[in-house]
From Swiss-Prot:
Compositional bias per record (Basic and acidic residues), positions renumbered to this chain: 320-331
Organism: Neurospora crassa (strain ATCC 24698 / 74-OR23-1A / CBS 708.71 / DSM 1257 / FGSC 987)
Gene: slt-11
Subunit structure and binding partners: Associated with the spliceosome.
Nucleus keyword on record: yes
Domain RRM span(s) in chain numbering: 239-312
Record's GO cellular component terms: post-mRNA release spliceosomal complex; Prp19 complex; U2-type catalytic step 1 spliceosome; U2-type catalytic step 2 spliceosome
Chief localization: nucleus
Region feature Disordered, mapped onto this chain: 157-233, 320-370
Low complexity: bias regions: 171-187
PROSITE patterns recorded: RRM
Role this protein plays: Involved in pre-mRNA splicing. Facilitates the cooperative formation of U2/U6 helix II in association with stem II in the spliceosome. Binds to RNA.
Listed name of the protein: Pre-mRNA-splicing factor slt-11
Amino acid sequence: MPPQIKHDLNRSGWEATDFPSVCENCLPENPYVKMLKEDYGAECKLCTRPFTVFSWAADRAHARKKRTNICLTCARLKNACQCCILDLQFGLPIIIRDKALELVAPGPQSEINREYFAQNNERAIEEGRAGVEEYEKADEKARELLRRLAQSKPYFRKGREVDEEGNPVNGSSSGAGRATGGNPAVGAGVGGVGPIRTRDSRAAAAAGARPGGGRRPNAAPAPPPGPKDWLPPADKSIMSLFVTGIEDDLPEFKIRDFFKAFGKIKSLVVSHMSHAAFVNYETREAAEKASAECKGRAVIAGCPLRVRWSVPKALGTMNKEQRSEMLRDGRSAFGSGQKTGGQKAIGGQNAQGGASGAQKDDASNLTIAAPPGAADVQYASLSGN
């Protein structure tokens, strides 16, 4: 008769559960969540006991995974989420919560004592003799402090009020600017046309760009935006705007914040490689409002963009020349100024006068070269005097 396998006393203290305890922020928007369960998949970060690990897809678009990091017993004792380890009531880190409520007690430090402490509390929770932290013992001032910390928002510097042309309004730095909170377009490029940043010619040269912005010698500049860019098309099913001129450091969330002010966005497809994006609205009215407000151009975080109606299509099939043209298309919507010496800021208005005006300016700025030898110094010794 083969010898019987003895019961492992250490394994008897390991935790095995059928459902996690997580907060709503860690769960996806889809109510039907598919979770993967792994018995004794990892060790708890607090009590170091093996526990049942649950993992699920947090974002369907990016296939990002989330998982539980502490066991269910420690989560119940700390009243925290198993995934983000934040307090379930206030949404704060448990260290800040315990410091404010003065609930910090010296716990076991060694690994074996942590396991013993967790096993005893697990048995007490099952019998109903123990539970979460006793919040009722904390005074009302500490609880009010936690409420203020949970409701706190990041501080943003209020910008000055600007008009439609980007000029500061008189008196905006006084009471008027503080009363209205400033214009969110300043600095962030949200809600209106803001200042356009200059192009770094040295960085472009280091990246291997051709002189003159990389345009081919025989390529004609793109025309400025016209009524055909912002007038709604006859096809009522078109509810998308084509945005070009997106630079590499312009994040997607700033583009979304800019265009969601006109209506609810169904989807936003941004391709930094192609320097273009498609903004798909849920309603035709929102798309028409955004197109009429932009008038074929927009400035987001100092990045000039061209906005026009279009039908959604694939953005990853462009070649190198087409991608470069998409990048230049944004600045061509605002007109380009001639650079003399260093960098020059590009204004928000179109260049007037066309090619004839540019030729006149070039002709007036021409200087006649001096004859050869005029700059040589005439010494008396060379003349024989």
